[in-house]
């Protein structure tokens, strides 16, 4: 993990265009190739980023940029598309690198952990012919909650949340990008499963080709037999 605090401007060029004017920001360069641009307020989310796989090229600025005070230019190129993140660094205030090693991943507790266990035991809840490959399928960027096969034998990656929001869809998207590079698993499609899924998350999931499934936690635990209820 490389952390750089710098005065910089940022441009995203590709399927969409975005510009961040000159300001002091935190640049995170991760071992998986992703680059994230953070500010000190507004949101815990990055202002802009490039997802892996991507390559970072550092170059000297052109004369016109030198005149504007640019000392170094970063070009982060997506390996899959023509999208680029261009970071013009005017001044580095701090820079440090750390080897964080292999992360064991998020250890879930409470309802999410129970949902994972229950769905793994009742994988047919997702459809006829579904079978479990394994829970906590490890990847270089973290564990996939459940990896399964559908009735046609295709691989399915399942992300579980108690309350599903956009961040969960983004997380599953990253897993799918990585898993689909494995010829032994591809093609891999995604299912975003939760007790409640926010409308914005459903829209984003649909745009990404990810199915959304609402889980009845009580019914899965055998507490609430929905078929026997009068109301």
Swiss-Prot record:
CC terms in the record's Gene Ontology section: cytoplasm
Protein name: Endonuclease NucS
Subcellular location: Cytoplasm
PANTHER family for the chain: ENDONUCLEASE NUCS
Role of this protein: Cleaves both 3' and 5' ssDNA extremities of branched DNA structures.
EC category: hydrolase
EC numbers: 3.1.-.-
Organism: Pseudarthrobacter chlorophenolicus (strain ATCC 700700 / DSM 12829 / CIP 107037 / JCM 12360 / KCTC 9906 / NCIMB 13794 / A6) (Arthrobacter chlorophenolicus)
MF annotations from Gene Ontology: DNA binding; single-stranded DNA endodeoxyribonuclease activity
Predominant place of localization: cytoplasm
Xref: InterPro entries: Endonuclease_NucS (IPR002793), NucS_C (IPR048301), NucS_N (IPR048302), NucS_N_sf (IPR049173), tRNA_endonuc-like_dom_sf (IPR011856)
Keywords noted in UniProt: Cytoplasm, DNA-binding, Endonuclease, Hydrolase, Nuclease
Family recorded in the similarity comment: Belongs to the NucS endonuclease family.
Pfam families linked to this entry: NucS_C, NucS_N
